[in-house]
């Protein structure tokens, strides 16, 4: 006989799981802190500098970045047109789809451009009382309440043909009496 009482008294070594704040985020791995002289992280010291890369050069590139944006000021010299005149100028050489989308936004759809013709016709067909055509449902017979199979039978007038529908199995094709 095994003594269960002794097995319960023995304690296994408990594992302690640290809190989420004990985990170092991946983005911080290798970061030695913000140094003023832009030294690479300690894990980067093992790699050789290729192609004249140095942190000092990156600082110069950031300072000289203003020369890249000289040409971008030319687009600012062009005066901005109001929205209505921009639409007119775009439709002169624009596509017919833009014209159609602008027409849809007109007042013939109650001022709401999202309403389409189909949905406005369908909304008029819905009865005002909010009722929809609901199909009537048959009540389950007492035989079906407890999860049993449902069988129905009917006789065709003037003949002995009987149709049986069985929802649980097709092998039981006996006649109901």
Curated annotation (Swiss-Prot):
Q: Where is this region: Disordered?
A: 72-177
PROSITE patterns in the record:
CRIB
| Descriptive protein name | CRIB domain-containing protein RIC8
Gene3D superfamilies on file? CRIB domain (3.90.810.10)
CDD domains for the chain: CRIB
Which segments constitute the CRIB domain? 17-30
Please note every region of biased composition (Basic and acidic residues): 72-89
Name the InterPro entries for this protein: CRIB_dom, CRIB_dom_sf
Function description: Functions as a downstream effector of Rho-related GTP binding proteins of the 'Rho of Plants' (ROPs) family. Participates in the propagation of ROP GTPase signals in specific cellular responses.
Gene name of this polypeptide: RIC8
Q: Where is the composition biased (Low complexity)?
A: 158-171
List the SMART domains hit by this protein, alphabetically: PBD (SM00285)
């Amino acid at each position: 006989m095994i003594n269960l009482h002794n097995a319960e008294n023995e304690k296994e070594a408990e594992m302690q799981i640290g809190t989420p704040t004990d985990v170092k985020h991946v983005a911080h791995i290798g970061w030695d802190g913000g140094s003023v002289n832009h030294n690479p992280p300690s894990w980067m010291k093992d790699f050789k500098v290729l192609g004249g890369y140095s942190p000092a050069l990156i600082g110069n590139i950031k300072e000289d970045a203003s020369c890249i944006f000289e040409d971008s000021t030319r687009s600012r010299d062009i005066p901005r047109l109001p929205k209505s005149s921009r639409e007119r100028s775009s439709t002169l050489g624009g596509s017919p789809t833009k014209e159609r989308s602008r027409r849809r936004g007109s007042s013939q759809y109650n001022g709401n451009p999202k309403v389409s013709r189909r949905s406005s016709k369908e909304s008029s067909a819905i009865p005002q009382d909010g009722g929809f055509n609901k199909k009537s449902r048959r009540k389950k017979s007492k035989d079906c309440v407890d999860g049993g199979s449902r069988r129905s039978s009917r006789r065709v007038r003037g003949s002995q043909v009987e149709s049986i529908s069985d929802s649980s199995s097709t092998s039981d094709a006996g006649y109901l009496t």
